Amino acid sequence: DFNSPLTVEKDDWGLAFVNVLKTSAESASLYNLWYELPQEKRYSHTYGKKRSALDHIVIAKTLSDGKGIEYKKGTFTPFIVPYMLESDGVPKRWQISDKGKGKHLGEGFSDHLPLTAIFHTISE
């Protein structure tokens, strides 16, 4: 959870993730797995009506060289299950009591969707 958007838009705060680590679809050494998904699927967080990719899995390109540990291409995705979403598709946030010290009410999840990817070993 870097809390850094994938790209900078007019009203974004701070630097975009691609600027911080110099990642891109063409990067020589690092690859952000968001680039595997179409633009409209690149989100793990929703604030209001704005969807953004604040969470990232960045891999070294050596994880796709056919040696040792390997990223299984095409397996990256936000983990989305219905019980983790509100009826409008927004992640169901933790429910915190507004009384006292903000006690968790035992309902809801993070406001960020988890990211998943499959890695495996290559037998030599």
Where do the PLM segments sit?
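Metal-dependent phosphoester-hydrolase catalytic domains
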Residues: 3-124
